[in-house]
Amino acid sequence: MYVRHLALTDFRSWSRVELELSPGRTVFVGPNGFGKTNLVEALWYSATLGSHRVASDAPLIRAGAERAVVSTIIVNEGRELAVDLDITSGRANKARLNRSPVRSAREILGVLRAVLFAPEDLALVRGDPGDRRRYLDELATTRRPRIAAVRADYDKVVRQRTALLKTASSARFRGDRGALETLDVWDGHLAAHGAQLIAARVDLVHELAPEVEKAYQLLAPASRPATVRYRSGVEVVEAEAAAGNSDPEVFEAALLDALSRRRDAELERGVCLVGPHRDDLELRLGDQPAKGFASHGESWSMALSLRLAAYELLRADGSDPVLLLDDVFAELDSARRQALAQVAASAEQVLVTAAVGEDIPVDWDARRIEIAMTDSDLGRVSVLSGVTQ
């Protein structure tokens, strides 16, 4: 799989750009703040419908513009697929597949399969559980696009149930049984959708575990062994996951029981205290959690291991995913740079950003695209300043 064409309109610092790409290695070179990362971000957005840098879409739209457009042409086993995404702040994205509109932008998920390495990856180790949940859900969705709908349905249930909890507390004191009966219904929805999401995550973690262990051993052979496991606030869910079981019916029953037991606490606080939106992917080095105990180098090795494991799972599913390397070589020591370069050597397409050419391995044969900034009627925008084959 590779990206043959990338076109952006009013995306970040780019007012308009069209790039013809090819298999092999391409390096986008330019000073920090000149827009090279925006190219990789656009491709990652096309693959996942999310940015690795911001949580909302508003910053993706160039200042002064009403919307941004990301267009790609993907080649997979000789077949071309064109994807167009219209990004409008505060509104649902619109998508086209081979120039035909699709009902939901989620329908384009899985067309571009990519793995991104970026400085933000340190948050997978040092950040909040939400960073690790997002990692799991993005990978699960890339491999099984239907999971995107499961996640969307679950998120909707959590929002609506949370709103109900905020009003049901006072209703209970008034003796209003209607609100509590409605809450029972939403408990069922949360348990059903939550169980499906947990099952997908648990299956994924079981496949990730040996790949993470292997990748970490490659990156840090003298360090402690790396392990991962799924953590849940529901004891039955965690025990079943640890035992290798991922039966949604078991998870659904466990969630319903936990919701019943935590009902009073939820009503008191007005938030959902049970469900996969509170779960975590635990990362351990030896007998210690990586978060809080891993050194800077160990944290980088663990973060890279998670991405390398994702790459190996996607490769095992079929065609090679596109590798996106955003300023990571400058962050790594020589051993980790070499390990990442070895993986990149076998990939069908690698797209890299670097502030200076010296950040790239010296033995790389790569096409080089220079990025610059210029002043225009639209303000300061990014432009292509040169291409070296």
From Swiss-Prot:
GO MF terms held by the record: ATP binding; single-stranded DNA binding
Gene3D superfamilies: P-loop containing nucleotide triphosphate hydrolases, RecF/RecN/SMC, N-terminal domain
InterPro entries, alphabetized: DNA-binding_RecF (IPR001238), DNA-binding_RecF_CS (IPR018078), P-loop_NTPase (IPR027417), RecF/RecN/SMC_N (IPR003395), RecF_2 (IPR042174)
Primary location group: cytoplasm
Highest taxon, organism lineage: Bacteria
Keywords from the UniProt entry: ATP-binding, Cytoplasm, DNA damage, DNA repair, DNA replication, DNA-binding, Nucleotide-binding, SOS response
CDD domains per record: ABC_RecF
Statement: the UniProt record of this protein carries the keyword ATP-binding: yes
Gene Ontology BP term (one): SOS response
Pfam families in alphabetical order: SMC_N (PF02463)
Subcellular location(s) per record: Cytoplasm
Binding site for ATP: 30-37
Cellular component terms (Gene Ontology): cytoplasm
PROSITE patterns: RECF_1, RECF_2
PANTHER family registered for this protein in UniProt: DNA REPLICATION AND REPAIR PROTEIN RECF
Similarity section: Belongs to the RecF family.
Function: The RecF protein is involved in DNA metabolism; it is required for DNA replication and normal SOS inducibility. RecF binds preferentially to single-stranded, linear DNA. It also seems to bind ATP.
Protein name listed in UniProt: DNA replication and repair protein RecF
Organism (species): Mycolicibacterium gilvum (strain PYR-GCK) (Mycobacterium gilvum (strain PYR-GCK))
